Design a protein with these regions (language model features):
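Alpha-helical membrane segments and immediately flanking helix-loop junctions
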Residues: 57-92, 119-137, 141, 155-158, ...
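Extracellular/periplasmic helix-exit of transmembrane alpha-helices
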Residues: 114-124, 128, 227-243, 251, ...
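Transmembrane helix-loop junctions in multi-pass membrane proteins
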Residues: 3, 33-38, 82-87, 163-174, ...
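Membrane-interface loop-to-helix entry segments
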Residues: 22-46, 171-177, 184-245, 378, ...
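Flexible loop linkers connecting adjacent transmembrane helices
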Residues: 36-65, 89-91, 95-99, 111-144, ...
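Helix-loop-helix module between adjacent transmembrane segments
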Residues: 30-31, 105-130, 136-171, 175-200, ...
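Selective recognition of specific alpha-helical transmembrane segments in multi-pass small-molecule
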Residues: 108-116, 190-204, 215-235, 268, ...
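N-terminal alpha-helical transmembrane segments of multi-pass membrane transport
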Residues: 1-77, 81, 92-98, 109, ...
């Protein structure tokens, strides 16, 4: 057991370091190339997203979704376990300082997610049924002109859908329901399988309609509950912020040199959890944004900036403050149970049930969203209906199995798959960054604030 534990810890160290060097590096580079536009053109970003929320563009194609539905579906895959369970895991593994690095990484992630969405819309095409399809596999194929890398990404995407989009989600939901209501893990797993199985036939249009209603409501309720906790614990907040920044930039970490600092535990865990939360650089969100009804790749890319802000900058920070305001991290509670306990200590016993139901709802939406990503990856590789059916059966089986796996094993698997999926996507974004920069510059020339 010790050798297995040692191997897992070593794997986490390697994956964490790779996340920092690859994703943070790409995010910083693109932020500079795009002249920090999420900050400089902040007003335009929000005006062209939420300001146009009820404006419906001309139909982009059969089976497409609105820009907001695309964003809601992408957020369904990120909000929930990454914000509720992932933050708790980050605090236990990397300490309060990890939260600061989640926030820092989220700023640079905005440019990265913007870039991959722009490319997804620019290189999208229509399938045999007249549906818009896009994503990294298409800009790898037609932009980088590497069908091999496109196929590799598709294989990795289909594989990752079983980790971040499946095992981690069902595990979080099952753990939360058991902690709050004593529901056995297999029961929650079976209910999740039934829900996902019944909705498989709806396709992207149905998923978009569900998520555009469920995600805003659940996120709003969760933020209101979090605000109540923080108001009741307001006197603790100054000390919490001091602790977070002190541990994020500790002298001990800095003494290891710049490289030692960058691969220190708080930075590793913060960036890795931040990526799990907002998925910037992974290439998942571009798959659904590539099907959005839009006449502008840049405007659709703005939604990626908003996603990162809402998901990591806002939701993750709020969750971290709630957990830290409730007590220390040295107990036996982990993941969803730790977050639920934090709400319960301040708001009372019923709060734990609320958190658990929230996690289940978010997890179910995430599983649906990632099933779409996985199916599109499989569809890119083969037109075989049998292959798609095999994927769906395997996906449903994984939902059930994930509910009963250990929390540590699930996160280790998810992080590794996230990294493998991100490598070809980030490489493509960097190779095609001139396309993104040109589109961004031309857009702001035509639409001056």
């Amino acid at each position: 057991m010790k050798s297995v534990e040692g191997f897992r810890n070593q794997l986490e160290e390697i994956v964490g370091s790779a996340f920092v060097l690859i994703l943070a590096g790409a995010g910083i580079f693109l932020s500079i190339r795009l002249r920090f536009f999420p900050l400089v053109h902040c007003k335009a970003v929000w005006r062209e997203t939420f300001g146009r929320l009820f404006h419906r563009a001309d139909k982009a194609g059969k089976g497409s979704v609105s820009p907001f539905q695309a964003t809601a579906t992408a957020l369904a895959g990120t909000l929930g376990t990454g914000n509720i369970v992932g933050v708790a895991t980050a605090l236990v593994s990397g300490g309060p300082g990890a939260v600061v690095w989640m926030g820092i990484s989220s700023f640079f992630s905005m440019a990265l997610k913007f870039a991959e969405i722009v490319l997804a819309v620019e290189y999208r095409t229509k399938d045999a049924n007249g549906h818009w399809v896009g994503g990294p596999m298409y800009y790898l194929q037609d932009g980088v002109r590497s069908p091999l890398l496109a196929a590799v990404f598709s294989v990795l995407c289909a594989s990752a859908s079983f980790g971040i989009g499946n095992l981690a989600q069902s595990n979080a939901a099952a753990g939360a329901m058991k902690a709050a209501f004593g529901i056995p893990l297999p029961v929650t797993g079976a209910v999740a399988v039934l829900f996902v199985g019944l909705t498989f036939c709806g396709g992207l249009s149905w998923i978009g309609k569900v998520t555009e209603r469920v995600v805003p409501v659940m996120a709003g309720i969760y933020l209101l509950a979090s605000a109540a906790v923080l108001l009741l614990s307001a006197e603790k907040l100054p000390g919490i912020f001091v602790r977070m920044f002190r541990e994020a930039f500790s002298l001990q970490a800095a003494s290891g040199g710049i490289l030692g600092f960058l691969i220190g535990r708080p930075v590793q865990v913060g960036v890795a959890r931040g990526v799990f939360s907002n998925e910037a650089g992974m290439g998942s969100a571009p798959i659904v944004h590539g099907a959005a009804e839009t006449d502008s790749s840049v405007r659709q890319g703005f939604w990626g900036v908003v996603e990162v802000f809402l998901d990591t900058t806002l939701m993750c920070t709020v969750t971290a403050l709630v957990i830290l305001s409730a007590g220390d991290l040295a107990g036996e509670l982990r993941g969803a149970a730790l977050t639920a306990s934090a709400f319960e200590r301040v708001l009372g016993r019923g709060a734990a049930g609320f958190v658990s139901v929230s996690i289940f709802a978010f997890a179910a939406a995430s599983i649906l969203g990632w099933s779409y990503y996985g199916e599109k990856a499989v569809a890119y590789l083969t037109t075989s209906v049998k292959a798609l059916r095999i994927y769906r059966v395997a996906y449903l089986l994984a939902v059930f199995v994930g509910a009963m796996l250990s929390l540590e094993a699930v996160w280790a698997i998810s992080d590794l798959l996230n990294l493998l999926m991100a490598i070809p996507n980030v490489a493509a974004v960097l190779l095609l960054q001139t396309v993104v920069v040109e589109k961004e510059r031309n857009y702001f020339k035509l639409h001056k604030n």
